[in-house]
């Protein structure tokens, strides 16, 4: 009886070791185990998803192409990243968004003004 118990313990240990090894190899070579979540997929490299969102957007006035904000005039469009960009309205009724300046205050505004004058 004692030999049978020892044999069953050894068999159980062997089976659990073999099972653990197969689980390791399955995980190493990309196998999916039950209960694991799949990683999210990258967005497609074409603009179809954006165009669908743009086509579904409703606006009575002007729909900003980069933020999909509905405004009265194109130069009222907000910048997509207001924490990182400064907005400048141009005399032609348009606006541009420029990355905020680095070290000096109002550096982006100074560079836009230099560009308007043709000095940059």
UniProtKB/Swiss-Prot annotation:
Belongs to the LCL2 family. The keyword Signal applies. It comes from Verticillium alfalfae (strain VaMs.102 / ATCC MYA-4576 / FGSC 10136). The keyword Signal applies. InterPro entries: LCL2 (IPR034543). The gene is LCL2. Transmembrane segments: none annotated. It comes from the Eukaryota. This is Long chronological lifespan protein 2. Probable component of the endoplasmic reticulum-associated degradation (ERAD) pathway. Residues 1-20 form the signal peptide. GO terms for biological process: ERAD pathway. Keywords: Signal.
């Amino acid at each position: 009886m004692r030999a049978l118990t020892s044999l069953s313990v050894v068999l159980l240990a062997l089976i659990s070791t073999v099972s653990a090894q197969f689980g390791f190899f399955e995980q190493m070579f990309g196998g999916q185990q039950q209960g694991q979540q799949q990683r999210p997929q990258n967005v497609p490299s074409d603009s179809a998803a954006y165009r669908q969102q743009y086509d579904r957007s409703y606006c009575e006035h002007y729909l900003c192409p980069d933020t999909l904000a509905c405004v009265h005039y194109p130069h009222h469009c907000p910048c997509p990243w207001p924490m990182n960009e400064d907005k400048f309205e141009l005399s032609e009724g348009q606006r541009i968004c420029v990355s905020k300046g680095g070290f000096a205050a109002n550096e982006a505004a100074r560079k836009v003004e230099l560009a308007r004058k043709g000095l940059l």
